Structures are given as C-alpha cells and as structure tokens.
Amino acid sequence: MSTSITLFGAGSWGTALAVHLAAAGRDVTLWARRDEAVERMRTTHRNPTYLSDIEIPPSVHVTSDLEAAAGASSLWAVAVPSQNLRSVATRIAPLTRPGTTVVSLAKGIENETLQTMSQVLADELGGMEAQQIGVLYGPSHAEEVAENQPTTLVAAAPTEPRAEWVQDAFMTERLRVYVNTDVVGVEIGGSAKNVLAIAAGIGDGVGYGDNAKAALVTRGLAEIRRLGIAMGAKPRTFAGLAGIGDLLVTCMSPHSRNRYLGEQIGNGMTLEEIESEMDMVAEGVRTTQSVQDLARHHDIEMPVTEAVHRVLFENRRPEDMVDELMTRSAKREHWLPQGLRNVS
C-alpha cells in the first residue's frame, strides 16, 4: 500500500512507527519540534534522544516545518505526550484540509478537562467532522515495533469505514491492526492501564510475587471496565487489545516506563527522584490524577487507582497500598454499580 503518513512527534513511539512503516514501503514524514534533532536525524539517520541505536531509513522525510509536514499527507498520527497534545493540535488545526484524518497515538486523559485524546483533538480541530478523528492503541512497546517484532494494534474511529481506512494504512506483515468503533472504550482501556502498571511495579519493588501481580491486573481491569461502562464504553472492548492486551504488556514488560517508575517507588525512591532521572515520560503519573477525578465524577469505585494516587501524591508508604487493598470489605467478583447492571 502506498499511503502517505505524517507522524507528529519524534519521541520513541513516533520514531518507531516511522522506522517500521518506512521499511514496509510507506511514504513517511516525521515532524520533530527541535531543529537540532532534525539535523541529527538527517545526517546520522539516528534519533539522538530516543531509540538511538535504531537506524532511521533514508526514505523517512524528517522536518521541523509544521506546514510542510501537514502538507505531505492526509493521514496525520499525533505521537506526543498526552498533556502536550492540545498545544500541538492547536498548531496543526489551521493546516487541516477536507479529507484529512487525524489519529492520536498518545494514551492519557487531559488533567485540566478530563477529556480523552480524541476529545481534545475534536476540541481543537473544530472544523473537522467527528468521524475524521480516531486513535491507534494496543500492546505495543516502541522498541519492539522498531525492531520489526510482531505487534497488534486496534484502530478506533466513530465509523467502521474510517477505522478500516486507518487499519489499511498502518497494517504491515509484522504490524497487525484490528478495527473497533468503541472509541471511548479503547481510550479508557489504553490510558487507565498505565495507572495499573505503576501499581504492578510498586508490587515488584516491594517484593510481592506473581499472585499479587495477577490480583492487581485482574482487579485493576475490573475497575477500568466499570469506569469505561459509566462513560459509555462497550464491556467487550476491555477483553480486547486496548484492554487486557495493553494492560498485560504494560504491567509485565521490562520496557514499561510506568512499571519501572512504580518499581523504583517500591524500592524507596521518591517520585521527584525518579522523574528527574528518566529520559522519557511515564504517562501514568498524570493519568492517575485524571482517572481518579473521572471516577469521582462518575461515582465509580476504583480502589487500585485510589491506592496508587495515595502513594504518588499523598506520601503513603508503598507497603500500605496492598495492605489497604487486601483488607477492604468483602465483594462479589463481578460487581457493577446498580445503574450499570443492565449493561452487557
């Protein structure tokens, strides 16, 4: 397929997709904010900051010219940290054209507005129809995508034809893409799992075993599902790639920034110390605040998220997190608030 794709953001994920898609024959433009990074990538075919051991194919058009990047394609994929998405969307909004499709690769919930990434894009790209905006999520560490390892993603958009178009654009022999029209479910699953990854990492750092991690993952998925249903998501989405798939890889993998951050907290480091030494953003820290606020807004009980919030922002001991979760009142395993019990 000869689709042209513009990737806004030359972090790990933007770089990995540029490398992978270009190797598969796509016409790829990669926009980076800093001129010096662009110059390094053009001359050395390496990203100086992210995935620096991976060669960027010469066919990738690297630029810091926003207008040139926007004009190179009618399919834009925005791969910037979630809390920076709005500022980038504001800049590209005047450059949209009829037929442009914009896909968010960022996973998160905006702190100030509690909007998902597609909602942020819809806010800023006001002239676009809702069906032109989607997301591409799933269990996908950038390192493995850049190395051409088998990976699966889900393209979510309000209409199936638009989601299928994104699917076709990104599908390669080693990148298999599925379609879903439950955009909010895909976004909540793909964003809230970062909170659970921090919880899993805290358990690793404290020294808890596989039983505890399995409990955190499964009970964490249950509370993500409750929140998603309250926001209009379809329950089955959380059994898919953006639900259990993304949750498993993020909670288990040594590549996971959020799991690593949690592990260091479990080892006794402070959040400030960890963030100062990390080169990359751990989205789960900011998402923890947003998800807790969403849970309170929708009156949804999310005990694992609340426990992570107390450790991150209220100076609670990591050891107390599991103790508090284990001594909660008895519950049914499959439980929903009364107003959601008819949802299947």
UniProtKB/Swiss-Prot annotation:
UniProt-annotated binding residues for NADPH: 12-13, 33-34, 107, 142, 257, 281, 283
Pathway involvement of the protein, from the record: Membrane lipid metabolism; glycerophospholipid metabolism
Binding site for sn-glycerol 3-phosphate: 107, 138, 140, 193, 246, 256-258
Major subcellular site: cytoplasm
SUPFAM superfamilies membership: 6-phosphogluconate dehydrogenase C-terminal domain-like, NAD(P)-binding Rossmann-fold domains
InterPro entries reported in the protein's UniProt record: 6-PGluconate_DH-like_C_sf, 6PGD_dom2, G3P_DH_NAD-dep, G3P_DH_NAD-dep_C, G3P_DH_NAD-dep_N, NAD(P)-bd_dom_sf
Single GO biological process annotation from the record: glycerol-3-phosphate biosynthetic process
HAMAP family, per the entry: NAD_Glyc3P_dehydrog
Species of provenance: Salinibacter ruber (strain DSM 13855 / M31)
UniProt-annotated location(s): Cytoplasm
GO molecular function terms listed in the Swiss-Prot or TrEMBL record: glycerol-3-phosphate dehydrogenase [NAD(P)+] activity; NAD binding
Similarity comment: family membership: Belongs to the NAD-dependent glycerol-3-phosphate dehydrogenase family.
Active site residues of this protein: 193 (proton acceptor)
Protein name: Glycerol-3-phosphate dehydrogenase [NAD(P)+] 2
EC assignment: 1.1.1.94
Keywords: Cytoplasm, Lipid biosynthesis, Lipid metabolism, NAD, NADP, Nucleotide-binding, Oxidoreductase, Phospholipid biosynthesis, Phospholipid metabolism
GO CC entries: cytosol
Task of the protein: Catalyzes the reduction of the glycolytic intermediate dihydroxyacetone phosphate (DHAP) to sn-glycerol 3-phosphate (G3P), the key precursor for phospholipid synthesis.
Catalysis performed (reactions): sn-glycerol 3-phosphate + NAD(+) = dihydroxyacetone phosphate + NADH + H(+); sn-glycerol 3-phosphate + NADP(+) = dihydroxyacetone phosphate + NADPH + H(+)
Any Pfam family: NAD_Gly3P_dh_C
Keyword presence, ATP-binding: no
Database matches in Gene3D superfamilies: N-(1-d-carboxylethyl)-l-norvaline Dehydrogenase, domain 2, NAD(P)-binding Rossmann-like Domain
Keyword Metal-binding: no
